[in-house]
Amino acid sequence: MSSLLRRAGAKRIVALTHGHEVWWSKVFPFNLIMRRIGKTTDSLTYLGEFTGSAIAGALSRKSSETMVKIAPGIDTDHFKPLDSKDLRKSLGLEHKKVIVSVGRLVHRKGQDFLIKSMPLILAQVPNAHLVLIGQGPYLKHLQSLVTKFRIHENVSFIGRIQYQELPQYICAGDIFAMPSRSRLAGLEVEGLGIVYLEASACGLPVVAGASGGAPDAVIESVTGYVVEGTDTQQISKRIVELLLDEELRKKMGDAGRQWIVKDWRWEIWAAKFAKLLAG
């Protein structure tokens, strides 16, 4: 493809990666394809430290030295702290400590272990409530877990919502949690975890899973915590700590918002990408 583009007049070719290239880089023959892409382009982008390291393993040393970090930026005018009192009231959450989680309902996103952690959380925070936003093939299994633990009154399934509504729903939470985990011997992982950054932009502390590049979206103990996605003790400990400490929640939420505005705004990454294209 690159040779055809150059014959057509392309002077500079940059290949963008999006996260799934991590497993490409580990599996034959896709790793050879990645190596060829690296050799025939002027630069290859990566999302964060985890994806950069994984992809570099499939490239030649020369190609890996041309890699540049280009991450998806966050629209901080869209994702920002909002007053969600009316939404909380409409959802029956006025007097609840709300854990909000946004993501496709699939195995590796960790909604199952959030539900499994709820009995431990409720033992210390009786008014805790888990709000799951998203849809996916794991829905029936998650609903069966809610039935198993008899926590129907403590878990809400919202389903899919519109992008325009997302900040309002995130801000309806006291904290954001998605304890994602890696699967298939590390081939199925989080490339970065944009939703953690969106939650930070909304001023919420986050609890993220130690899967792939998800930790790149959290400053540990500053904007939130990283936990093992299958450890209910770790998950519940961090969630309880945040739900019981309003001052800590505000401190981490404010730090997260400041970090996103400083380092993750889409304008910043657009400018870096334009510079990369210009050479």
What label would you give each PLM region?
Residues 12-15, 35-82, 93, 157:
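Donor nucleotide-sugar binding/catalytic pocket of nucleotide-sugar-dependent glycosyltransferases
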Residues 219-221, 225-232, 241-247:
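Conserved acidic donor-binding segment of nucleotide-sugar-dependent glycosyltransferases
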Residues 160, 171-189, 204:
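Acidic donor-binding loop of glycosyltransferase active sites
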Residues 11-28, 43:
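A short, histidine- and acid-enriched strand-loop-helix "catalytic/donor-clamping" loop
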Residues 45, 93-109, 115-118:
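Conserved donor-binding/catalytic core segment of Leloir-type glycosyltransferases
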Residues 127, 154, 234, 241, ...:
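A short, well-ordered alpha-helix in the C-terminal region of glycosyltransferases
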Residues 140-165, 175:
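Nucleotide-activated donor-binding/catalytic signature segment of Leloir-type glycosyltransferases, i.e.
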Residues 196, 201, 205-208, 218:
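Short hydrophobic beta-strand element within catalytic cores of glycosyltransferases
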